[in-house]
Structure formats: structure tokens, C-alpha cells
């Protein structure tokens, strides 16, 4: 890609200027994903780089092996890593990305950190988990490691285990399944459908279930820009009984049923179920 090559040559010139002015600090550049073409171009046209930063999500654990296979010999780090991104997952028939459960996301955090710790070449400087807090991005629960109330999600437990080798004294609950009792992801507005979840807690703490229907987000931005939270429809959920509830499909459109499970000890977990009112 001639344009990309011109960019890397220009960045090389800038790096030389920076090093001439400040030789005591390394020069680092961050790219999105461990893309083979980008890495080869950097190796050929940007020799002054000292540290390569990579932002990666679903495939973050493969960044180190990819660099090694291409002959990369300089330090690198994961400048951002987290759960599979909303652009990396399957979608429903109406285009809604399928969000992994908080527990499935935690497994991705753990596997990524293990890959960094197992880096045989000794070139990995570490990584930054995204993100310590909560954020509306595609959904209110996709990327945050904490709930708005401060409760930790399973991803916090996962990074603690990877860093220390030990699980926290109190671990977050787990949602094993969430779905309509009779598969009805698409149904007429106004119809009522039963939903059931299966959840558990490692310490057998009593669990509290919170159900909420929200519209599918329409304010989708790029690059992490702030998004408006979609409208919620609390009246759409009736007859909640712990891990079970009934949902009245709202007026025509795309929605999600969110489930938050709390253990009363500062831990929580989340999952959601997309559905479409016809």
C-alpha cells in the first residue's frame, strides 16, 4: 500500500527528530491489531521505533506469536486489550451484534494475559486492560470491568488471577445461560414471552437478579467516541422471580433484555438477549 508506506516513512522522520531532541526516552507507536502487512511495513520503513503498541481484542493473545513469526525483535505491549469487540462477533438477522456474557469476556482477558506472561522471547512489556470503569459503547455492558455502582465484574477476577496466581477471596457470580423458554427472538409487539437464566456463585452467596429491556443502540460511534445510552423500557418486564421473568415485546423495533446478577458482596455479572418486535 503506497500510501501506508509514505506514512511510515514520515513517522520514521518524526521519530528521528524526537530522538535528536530527547534521546533519553524511547519512541513508541500504536497500531490497531497485529496486522501482518502493517508490521512488515514498520519493520522495513520505520527502524527508529523502540516499542510497538498493539490494540487488540478477540485476537489479542495471538499478538506475541504473530510478531515472533514475522521476526520482530523489539519490545512490544498491548496498549489496549479486552473482550471480543462488537465488530468481531456474529450478528442477529436484524444486525445486532451478539455480546458475550461477562463470564465469557473474563475468559478472554485471562487468556490474553496468560499469553503475555508466557511470551518466550522476553519482549513483552505488558498490557492495559480496557476498561476500568463502565461505558456505553454499542451496549452499556460491553467493555466495562465495573458496574456504575462500583461492583466488579468477572473480568476483574480474571486479571487478578492472571497477575497474582490467586483468585480474589470473593469471586463474581456466573451466568451459565440466558434465553427464551420457547425460542422467540422475533415476535409480534405486545406478545408476552418467558425468559429463564441459570446463574451460580462460587461462594454460594445469595443472588439478586435485575432485569431491564433497552432499545438497541442507534448512536453507534467509532474510535471510542462517547455514545448516548439507548432508551429503557422497565414496564416491558413483568413477573420477575429470581432467574425467571416475562417480557412483553415493546413496539416494533430492536431491543435487548439485560440481566445483572449481584452477590451482595461487591461482585456482579451480566448478560443480554437481543430480540426484535415485529
Predicted regions and their residues:
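Active-site neighborhood of glycoside hydrolase catalytic domains
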Residues: 1-55, 60-61, 66-73
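Substrate-binding clefts and catalytic carboxylate motifs of secreted carbohydrate-active enzymes
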Residues: 68-223, 271
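Surface-exposed, flexible coil segments in extracellular/virion-facing regions
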Residues: 215-246
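Residue-level recognition of secondary-structure-to-loop junctions
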Residues: 247-251
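Exposed beta-strand face motif in extracellular beta-rich ectodomains
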Residues: 253-257
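Extracellular and select intracellular beta-sandwich modules with Ser/Thr-enriched
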Residues: 267-273
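Short beta-strand edge segments in extracellular beta-sheet folds
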Residues: 274-278
